């Protein structure tokens, strides 16, 4: 939010991306329920890795054999990061099923926490991400995945670094930035 309490352009675009991701999350929840509750955090990290690695492969090769584009992979990264944050927040709980409204509230809660992190970082760094290449942000997502894997291999212990939550939040935000950038690039191409 700006000083006058109106949302910034970034927040508006961010919420548009998240709204689309949540709608897909809700549909998959209707199809599969909360079967993802069985996944441990390292399994979710690996799912995020698969998505990010496919994006990088497509970026490097300039082609793909499977029809789904990178946009869908970024959406998957966002939803898997939110699922991981939900899982982390529910550590110790053996509850497997959630009512749709409760699950929606928990999803939104993790988004709001992560959006607050974005606001704080944008305050300090400006909107540097807007000048970054999508390929660079993809590399940063992959780096965060490898950091997360190392933390997981160390039983979640760090000496001076942030824990896995911060890495999931950063990956989520970079994936949102990539989708915003892709959308803006598509709009610019259509205007030409």
Segments from the language model and where they lie:
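Intrinsically disordered, low-complexity regulatory regions
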Residues: 1-192
